[in-house]
Amino acid sequence: ETYIPEDESLDFVFTSPPYVGWEAYGDEPEQSFNKFKEQDEWRNGFLLKTIKNAYIGLKPGKRAAFNVANVKSYKTFEEDTHQCMVEAGFRSIDVWWLSLSTQQGARQVATLEGDESEKKQSNNYIGKFERPDLPGRKYKPIFIGVK
């Protein structure tokens, strides 16, 4: 949230911001999970500020991609990221879907017809941006915005 690029100096932004309280990149007091103890504080003080800084740096007509996923400790991370993107001034133009692999060696389930299907994930981290055409599969949305 402290890095502010030069105005309109970037051709593309791709980021996967740290998930509040879920990913710790160090013990320094300036780390976002140390600075912002409450989810709303983190959303407004880190996530929104970071996305606004990306908007400042992006050239007009250029795109940004925000790769996130809901987690148990932050069930609205996807929705909050998308909302912050729009609040910062981005026009939401697309959602790309990143398919998450299943654990290697995970059991496969065979049907009577002999077809194998992936073991269903017991945790649903997808929120309102779940792919309706592939229910039960785990995907992360990558929100695409244009300045």
Residue positions per predicted region:
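Short, low-complexity, polar/charged sequence segments that are solvent-exposed and flexible
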Residues: T15, S32-N34, Q83-E87, L112-G114
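Conserved Class I SAM-dependent methyltransferase catalytic core
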Residues: D40-S101
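Mobile active-site "lid"/loop adjacent to the S-adenosyl-L-methionine
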Residues: Y3, S9-T50, K72
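Class I S-adenosyl-L-methionine
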Residues: K72-H82, F90-K147
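Short coil/turn segments at beta-strand junctions that form active-site/ligand-binding loops
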Residues: E8-S9, K62
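Short conserved AdoMet
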Residues: P5, K59-P60, K147
